[in-house]
A protein has these predicted regions:
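Structural signature of multi-pass alpha-helical membrane transport proteins
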Residues: 1-93, 149, 153-258, 326-332
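Membrane-embedded alpha-helical segments of transport systems
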Residues: 12, 74-82, 107-112, 128-149, ...
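Transmembrane helix-boundary motif of multi-pass solute transporters/channels
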Residues: 24-38, 52, 63, 270-295
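Helix-loop junctions at the membrane interface of multi-pass solute transporters
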Residues: 60, 113-125, 249-253, 279-285, ...
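The feature identifies polytopic integral membrane transport proteins across all domains of life
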Residues: 65-72, 93-107, 124-134, 163, ...
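Membrane-interface helix-loop-helix junctions at boundaries between adjacent transmembrane segments
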Residues: 87-143, 148, 152-163
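Helix-helix packing/entry segments at the starts of transmembrane helices
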Residues: 193-199, 256-272, 278-279
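C-terminal transmembrane helix pair
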Residues: 273-332
Length: 332
């Protein structure tokens, strides 16, 4: 019972979805169905975010260059440095491909939809999150293969215009359309914030189920032993904890407010499964792809669960701060 008090309903939903995908993964004709459903849910998420953000908020988010600069440093400098140090150290005798997999994980761009959804759930700066996460994903398509070639001795990799177009079509276009629709649906969106919050959560659950179903079908539980699996889980938790702590420290050190701190934490600590697996298919031989992306797949699940708990905690802090401000205003 104590566990259920610690974990919020959304975190329990994530665990349930992972178990569901492990025992009942999407197969056959259901695979394209869930892929299309996930795409539609993500597009709806960004449409709603565009509709509920004012023009002034978007301009302010895009112009928040100090925040964006630190998020990029966290994603493409801090993470790779930690990955290189860990791969050089090799503290445990496991398959060397697992160390390469963690190094590859650290080079990837940030995930977009969950970073923005968690920022929204926690009461952070959503406009800045949209700009930072989208920019990270777009830059990563070009920068990540270059970093792979630099630190992993893989050559002949380059960015894919098709992936750039997919990001523009699936994420930025719905956001722009939603914002352009704001004069007609803005009031309705304001009255239905709880329903929109459910849209955020549902999109994340669909991504988790679809991604983990594919991993299970590809034999994730048959490729590694329990010892290696425990190694991946522990390293993923430690890596994520280090990055989150550094991001919180730097956000406060640089003088960001609470909303911006939330954005930095959720945008600067994520790694993209959606970009990482297709990129691995291009960069690495087929025979090693499974082991290379295994740390990424497990890290992806852990980051979602950890960030769900963090989002709940930040939301409670944000609500308390707002209540204090309202109380002070009423007294004045």
């Amino acid at each position: 019972m104590k566990l259920f008090r610690i974990l919020d309903p959304f975190t329990l939903s994530l665990i349930t979805v992972v178990l569901l995908a492990s025992f009942f993964p999407a197969r056959g004709d259901f695979v394209p169905f869930f892929e299309n459903l996930t795409t539609a849910a993500i597009a709806l998420l960004f449409f709603m975010h565009g509709a509920k953000l004012s023009r002034e908020a978007i301009i302010a988010g895009g112009g928040h260059w100090r925040l964006h600069l630190w998020v990029m440093c966290s994603t493409f400098v801090l993470f790779p440095i930690l990955g290189v140090l860990f791969a050089w150290w090799k503290p445990v005798n496991v398959d060397p491909m697992l160390y390469s997999g963690f190094l590859y994980l650290c080079i990837l761009p940030a995930t977009v939809q969950s970073a923005i959804a968690f920022t929204s759930m926690a009461g952070g700066n959503v406009a800045a999150a949209v700009c930072s996460a989208s920019a990270s994903s777009l830059l990563g398509i070009f920068l990540s293969p270059l970093l792979v070639g630099l630190v992993m001795n893989v050559h002949g990799a380059g960015g894919s215009l098709e992936q750039v177009g997919k990001i523009m079509l699936q994420l930025l276009l719905p956001f722009v359309l939603g914002h352009l629709s704001r004069p007609w649906i803005g009031d309705w969106v304001s009255r239905n914030k709880k329903w929109i919050a459910k849209t955020d959560q549902t999109s994340i659950l669909l991504v988790v189920y679809t991604a983990f179903s594919e991993a299970v079908v590809n034999g994730i539980w048959h490729k590694v032993g329990w010892g290696s699996l425990l190694f991946i889980v522990v390293v993923s938790c430690v890596l994520l904890a280090i990055v989150i702590v550094i991001n919180v420290f730097m956000a406060r050190r640089l003088g960001f407010n609470k909303a911006d701190e939330i954005t930095i934490v959720f945008c600067g600590s994520k790694k993209s499964l959606a970009n990482g697996i297709p990129m691995a298919n291009i960069l690495f031989p087929t025979s090693v792809i499974g082991m290379m992306v295994l740390p990424l797949m497990i890290f992806h699940q852990i980051q979602l669960m950890v960030c769900a708990v963090l989002a709940r905690r930040y939301k409670r802090q944000t609500e308390q701060l707002q209540a204090q401000q309202e109380s002070s205003a009423n007294k004045a």
